[in-house]
Curated annotation (Swiss-Prot):
Catalyzes the pyruvoyl-dependent decarboxylation of aspartate to produce beta-alanine. GO terms for molecular function: aspartate 1-decarboxylase activity. InterPro entries: Asp_de-COase-like_dom_sf (IPR009010), Asp_decarbox (IPR003190). It is found in: Cytoplasm. The keyword Iron does not apply. SUPFAM superfamilies: ADC-like (SSF50692). The active site is at S26, Y59. Is synthesized initially as an inactive proenzyme, which is activated by self-cleavage at a specific serine bond to produce a beta-subunit with a hydroxyl group at its C-terminus and an alpha-subunit with a pyruvoyl group at its N-terminus. It comes from Legionella pneumophila (strain Paris). Binds 1 pyruvoyl group covalently per subunit. This is Aspartate 1-decarboxylase. Its EC number is 4.1.1.11. The gene is panD. Keywords: Autocatalytic cleavage, Cytoplasm, Decarboxylase, Lyase, Pantothenate biosynthesis, Pyruvate, Schiff base, Zymogen.
Length: 133
């Protein structure tokens, strides 16, 4: 059996609200956003900084319920500045024969990290969010 690493979900254009060098590594995300993006606490995520062009891998931790904070912790805090826009992506392993039917989930948030829209990722479909926002 062959497996492929595929995009599972992403939180698109989240705004970094805090960067904490002194906290152990991770990215803090509200439980509400984690749930709709199907990301578990301690799950590995890639973070792509739209503003600065940096990329890194870390793991998600649960923030406070109802919070809109996105906090990058530990050494990765050097790679972001509060106000930066980021994409937070999670991946999964899928059997090769199931890949054609796979549709990742995209979670869109507004400039305050409040849930705006959830939809499947579709190749060739452009975001309705203009850049720069």
């Amino acid at each position: 059996m062959a497996y492929r690493k595929m995009l599972k979900s992403k939180i698109h254009r989240a705004c970094v609200t805090q960067a904490d060098l002194d906290y152990e590594g991770s990215i803090t995300i509200s439980p509400e956003l984690l749930k709709v993006a199907n990301i578990l606490p301690y799950e590995a995520v890639n973070v792509w900084n739209i503003t600065a062009g940096t990329r890194f891998e870390t793991y998600a931790i649960t923030g406070e319920k109802g919070s809109t904070d996105i906090c990058v912790n530990g050494a990765a805090a050097h790679l972001v500045t509060p106000g930066d826009l980021v994409i937070i992506a999670s991946f999964t392993q899928i059997l090769e024969e199931d890949c054609a039917a796979h549709e990742p989930t995209v979670v869109f948030v507004d400039q305050f990290n409040r849930l705006k829209e959830i939809r499947p990722e579709r190749i060739g479909v452009k975001s309705r969010i203009p850049y720069p926002a």
